[in-house]
Amino acid sequence: MTKSELIEAIASKQPHLAHKDVEDAVKKMLEHMSETLANGKRIEIRGFGSFSLHHRPARMGRNPKTGEPVALPAKYVPHFKPGKELRERVNSSRHQAPLRSQ
């Protein structure tokens, strides 16, 4: 699901809200979440999951074309850990219907 599809789905289920208001709310929420992670803070949404940063230490990699060693700097990467309710819901729905390939 893309951001546009999410906005459409919410707007169709909430006809009393203007489409533009739904779009603004989704964009602001995602922007705030990005800023929070960029500031090194954790986000926890009970029943859904938590977003945090994981540290990846510096390492030596290889250029796939030349095979030359390349120094890769340390970095932080976003990480999502699903909550118990989300895991259970996903697992129960997977047993009922096969996954659709896109």
Curated annotation (Swiss-Prot):
- The biased composition feature labelled Polar residues covers 93-102
Among the record's GO biological process terms, what is one?
regulation of translation
For this protein, the record's InterPro entries field holds: Hist_DNA-bd, Histone-like_DNA-bd_CS, IHF-like_DNA-bd_dom_sf, IHF_beta
* UniProt cross-references to SMART domains, sorted A to Z: BHL
GO function terms (MF aspect): DNA binding; structural constituent of chromatin
Q: Does the keyword Cell membrane apply?
A: no
Alphabetical keyword list: DNA recombination, DNA-binding, Transcription, Transcription regulation, Translation regulation
Query: One cellular component GO annotation, for this chain's record?
Result: cytosol
Sequence ranges of Basic and acidic residues compositional bias: 82-91
Q: Where is this region: Disordered?
A: 54-102
The UniProt entry, under Pfam families, shows: Bac_DNA_binding (PF00216)
Signal peptide per UniProt? none
The record ties this protein, via CDD domains, to:
IHF_B
Function recorded in the entry: This protein is one of the two subunits of integration host factor, a specific DNA-binding protein that functions in genetic recombination as well as in transcriptional and translational control.
Question: Can you tell me which family this protein belongs to?
Answer: Belongs to the bacterial histone-like protein family.
Q: What is this protein called?
A: Integration host factor subunit beta
The organism encoding this protein is: Halorhodospira halophila (strain DSM 244 / SL1)
